Amino acid sequence: MNSVEVAEPTEVPEPIPIIETSDDDNNTNTNTAPTPVLASNGFTNGHSHTNGHHAHGHATPSYIDSMAHLSVIRDDSDAASVRSNSSRASRRPQMQLSNYQDEFTTSVYGSRFAGMDLPRHHMPECEMPRDIAYRMIKDDLSLDNNPMLNLASFVTTYMEDEAEKLMAESFSKNFIDYEEYPQSADIQNRCVNMIGDLFHAPVGTAVGTSTVGSSEAIMLAVLAMKKRWKKRQAAAGKSTENPNIVMSSAVQVCWEKATRYFEIDEKLVYCTMDRYVIDPDEAVDLCDENTIGICTILGTTYTGEYEDVKAINDLLVERNIDVPIHVDAASGGFVAPFVVPDLEWDFRCEKVVSINVSGHKYGLVYPGVGWALWRDPEYLPQELVFNINYLGADQSSFTLNFSKGASQVIGQYYQLIRLGKHGYRAIMSNLTRTADYLTETLEKKGFVIMSERSGAGLPLVAFRFRTPQEGGDEDRHYDEFALAHHLRSRGWVVPAYTMAPNSNVKMLRVVVREDFTKTRCDSLISDVTLCLGLLDETDRESIKKREEYIKKHITTSGKGKHAHPSYANETHSLQGKTGKTHAIC
């Protein structure tokens, strides 16, 4: 049996000096700090005292020194007395140093900052403790909607912890600095190769680059098409004025930006009541010698339909028209190859010269990362590519920006090798099944389904109320926007849109993302049923008043007015001209 050794009482160590700052000057003096002492009973004592004397000079009772676990109770006047009796240093010029002292508190909400507004227009003069800054901003952001309940956006809202850790470790890396971060640059090249292979890009000739999203990728592709067209026209001695591009009126707003910024005329193929995508014959008929290209969409923003790239390609070949195709695969580029692999929309079509895809949508990476790929350097004019010697390394660059973080590219690489084709196929198959389940349920509730099913389009559900002509309720006194507002009160962000021009349709859209499980889908269905019941029980006048109130108090409705007043009522875009909603994607 082991014996227990009893520790001898620990001797009192030398007192620790404390430097105290006087309130009225910068002089310092030395006092002694009470030192913890381990008593023979194993407990730590209170404060020890020096020379057996009180700070006021009075004799300390002798039993105090002999009882190490007791302490004399003092007040602030004792310390003040010590300071007043200390010798003063000689007067000297004062340095202009900050007198600001940190404010310590036992709680963030007990600090003075909790009773102040967060700065909005001017940088504050003084610092704020980091824990308070974090909590104040976190509390402010808590008023945002829950991203997982935001069914308006295609943007990824879930990544694994390991992916997040890798990305966080790369926050400080400037991707453009190839010399210092060669592996990060090589990882981009690996991603370009893998995505190019997924899109059946010609081996050995295809080129590509990462971007901050599909908008930048589209801008680059449009620039390349315009420059190539301009060179061809100049070589033939023809005018290089008034270039145009053919596209559907359902395009995302970045296409309108590209045509406006780069001075290109739009030739629109308008949607109809029963067709929400481009018409191949009409698109090809609109082409002329000034057409720089045709935009086709692999998954439209509104209904998720895949436009018929193969049909347009075949018509161009059949009529011997030298017009290239760009495929906007922002949403569908990581879906179609796994759900409908036999669908020909990519570089298998000879007229397809460039493709963009968003890594931060169904590529399953947090925003923002996108990819732009070209069939051959022939379709990416050399005069658009800059060879830059930056920080010691020669590099070819074709981007609209320069510095950017490497973390999103690394996140994309993680997903590509972590999931592989099998993993992506499993995820996209689940999303397609969930979208079909939601489609069937909403259809049974009397909605008209506008989106495709069984993988023929993106995993989303676009739906609307039936009109009286379609057998809908003639007495229904609310629309899709009213239902969207009621769903928001339940936490769901289900957007209501005005469809593309000439279709004259209102609609709702649910984007089925990776984290939208069947259980969450059932919760949404229950809340749709609840909101429909509430709307049925609410009279027309009350609904109208509520809509007017929401419009008046737009900040609290989640639709704050962020447009600058000078630009609030623009009339140059499709939204300004026709009322089409520039939908979130």
Predicted regions and their residues:
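Structured alpha-helical segments in the cores of large, soluble enzyme domains
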Residues: 188-195, 251-255, 279-287, 401-408, ...
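Hydrophobic alpha-helix feature that most strongly marks membrane-spanning transmembrane helices
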Residues: 291, 295-296, 317, 335, ...
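Non-catalytic terminal extensions of PLP-dependent enzymes
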Residues: 2-6, 16-23, 33-42, 52-185, ...
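A short glycine/serine-rich beta->alpha loop
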Residues: 152-155, 175-179, 204-212, 357-360, ...
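Conserved PLP-enzyme active-site core in the AAT-like
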Residues: 91, 96, 100-105, 212-386, ...
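Secondary-structure capping and boundary motifs in well-ordered enzyme cores
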Residues: 183, 210-217, 247, 251, ...
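Glycine- and acidic
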Residues: 171-179, 203-209, 240-242, 266-271, ...
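Active-site C-terminal subdomain of aminotransferase-like
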Residues: 326, 338-459, 463-471, 476
